């Protein structure tokens, strides 16, 4: 079994734990590779085991950090590699274990005592050109703070809403605990097959969040005369011209998480309570 290790670059504790995991697996004769950015910030790994995320061809990646670390892995690996997420962030909605549980969890993995939780992603096309898939959300924002943008969005060809707002969040169930929740969107069980549409600070009180089936094709018309900003999972940003069409649909790819329990609650809701 081949492992990749990725760590949060700005926390020494995460880098030190990454090294301990690396050393444990090497001593037990497993093939292990380390993200080159972790090596730059903590150059104690063997240089021959250092790879960029894009070049990692492994059976599992151990991501030590917050949700941002997990999203960085997702956006920089070319294959759907299972991820064991170790929480060294603020809340760790995507994490399966805490740092103290790391080596027990690895022992269970080596014994085959785990399962894979697949999460849907969404794909966005700008004028039919695809950009990176999103595990959490795609966000369309006004490029000038304090200025609203005018959007129309259609679900399967039918007009769903015509809004003037700061923007629009298109989210997966996984992303319902992220930006969409802070913007007043619903908390959605990650096992549901759905896509969320959450207006950001709409002018009209009638513009409410909408949940549609994940088989839906969503088209957004940008009618404002100024540029907009489009973000994917907070990892990819681009400025786009006015008067264009954006299409969002379910991606054929999925994110795979290593899990040890099929129980969703109460851990899921406890993290929400901790957030607020």
Swiss-Prot record:
InterPro entries: ATP-NAD_kinase_N (IPR017438), ATP-NAD_kinase_PpnK-typ_C (IPR017437), NAD/diacylglycerol_kinase_sf (IPR016064), NADK (IPR002504). One of its GO terms (biological process) is NADP biosynthetic process. Involved in the regulation of the intracellular balance of NAD and NADP, and is a key enzyme in the biosynthesis of NADP. Catalyzes specifically the phosphorylation on 2'-hydroxyl of the adenosine moiety of NAD to yield NADP. Pfam families: NAD_kinase, NAD_kinase_C. The gene is nadK. NCBIfam families: PRK03708.1. Its main location: cytoplasm. SUPFAM superfamilies: NAD kinase/diacylglycerol kinase-like. It catalyses: NAD(+) + ATP = ADP + NADP(+) + H(+). GO terms for molecular function: ATP binding; metal ion binding; NAD+ kinase activity. GO terms for cellular component: cytoplasm. Its cofactor is a divalent metal cation. It comes from Thermococcus sibiricus (strain DSM 12597 / MM 739). This is NAD kinase. It comes from the Archaea. It is found in: Cytoplasm. Its EC number is 2.7.1.23. Belongs to the NAD kinase family. The keyword Coiled coil does not apply. Keywords: ATP-binding, Cytoplasm, Kinase, NAD, NADP, Nucleotide-binding, Transferase. The active site is at residue 67. NAD(+) binds at residues 67-68, 72, 136-137, 147, 164, 166, 177-182, 201, 235.
């Amino acid at each position: 079994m081949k492992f990749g290790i990725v760590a949060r670059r700005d926390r020494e504790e995460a880098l030190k734990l990454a090294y301990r995991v690396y050393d444990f697996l090497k001593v037990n004769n497993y093939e292990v590779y380390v993200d080159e950015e972790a090596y730059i910030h903590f150059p104690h790994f063997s240089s021959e085991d250092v790879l960029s995320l894009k070049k990692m061809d492994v059976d599992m990646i151990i991501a030590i950090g917050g949700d941002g670390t997990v999203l960085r892995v997702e956006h920089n690996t070319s294959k759907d590699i299972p991820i064991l997420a170790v929480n060294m962030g603020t809340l760790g909605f995507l994490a399966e274990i805490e740092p103290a549980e790391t080596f027990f969890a690895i022992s269970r993995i080596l014994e085959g005592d785990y399962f894979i939780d697949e999460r849907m992603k969404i794909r966005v096309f700008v004028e039919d050109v695809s950009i990176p898939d999103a595990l959490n959300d795609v966000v369309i924002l006004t490029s000038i703070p304090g200025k609203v943008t005018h959007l129309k969005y259609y679900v399967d060809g039918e007009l769903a809403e015509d809004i003037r707002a700061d923007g629009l969040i298109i989210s997966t169930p996984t992303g319902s605990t992220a930006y969409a929740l802070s913007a007043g969107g619903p908390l959605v069980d990650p096992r549901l097959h759905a896509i969320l549409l959450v207006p950001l600070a709409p002018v009209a009180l009638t513009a409410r969040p909408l949940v549609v089936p994940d088989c839906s094709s969503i088209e957004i018309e940008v009618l404002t005369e100024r540029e907009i900003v489009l973000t994917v999972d907070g990892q990819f940003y681009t400025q786009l011209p006015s008067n264009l069409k954006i299409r969002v649909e379910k991606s054929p790819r999925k994110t795979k998480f290593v899990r040890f329990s099929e129980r969703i609650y109460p851990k899921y809701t406890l993290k929400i309570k901790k957030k607020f």
